[in-house]
Amino acid sequence: MTSPKLPLLVLACALPLAACAATPEALKPYPAASSGYNRHVIELPAQADEAEHKVELIAGKTLEVDCNTQRLGGQWQEKTVEGWSYNYYELGQVGPAMSTLMACPDNSRKQAFVPVGGEPLLVRYNSKLPLVIYAPADVQVRYRIWSAAPDTSPAPQQ
């Protein structure tokens, strides 16, 4: 005999996942991914004060690297859906890896995530709209949530 608590537990676990999935209706204004690109959609949970948070978008590839610092070339663009004023982000073609040229010890090669270089892309935190990103199909898109410290510090006058 199945415990009546098990179906309730499964339902309780599944509901938050269903709520976080972007509905086709929410994505309708956004263009489909063009050939060779993938569309990535991030649904952010609601925060008490969303102005105190930012989302950092990080794109890159998992490559075989050595002890040198590696970066990929690429440029983010912020675009707007026509007629909707919804923003989305597009990463253009990602160039070859750039690297420092230090001598590395033998057997220092490993698989690691190599990000697209340049300034980090920090975007406004908004749980009411999906965060839509278009990137080349061979590129991974990751993100990180930044939160402001609750205290501020006065700037000294000079």
Describe each model-derived feature in a short phrase.
Residues 34-36, 49-51, 83, 125-127, ...:
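Solvent-exposed loop and beta-edge segments used for protein-protein assembly and interaction
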Residues 9-18:
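Bacterial N-terminal signal peptides
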Residues 1-2, 17-23:
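Basic/polar N-terminal segments that are highly enriched at the extreme N-terminus
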Residues 51-118:
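Mature extracytoplasmic domains of secretory-pathway proteins
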Residues 21-64:
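N-terminal export/targeting and maturation segments
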Residues 1-9:
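Bacterial N-terminal signal peptides that target proteins for export
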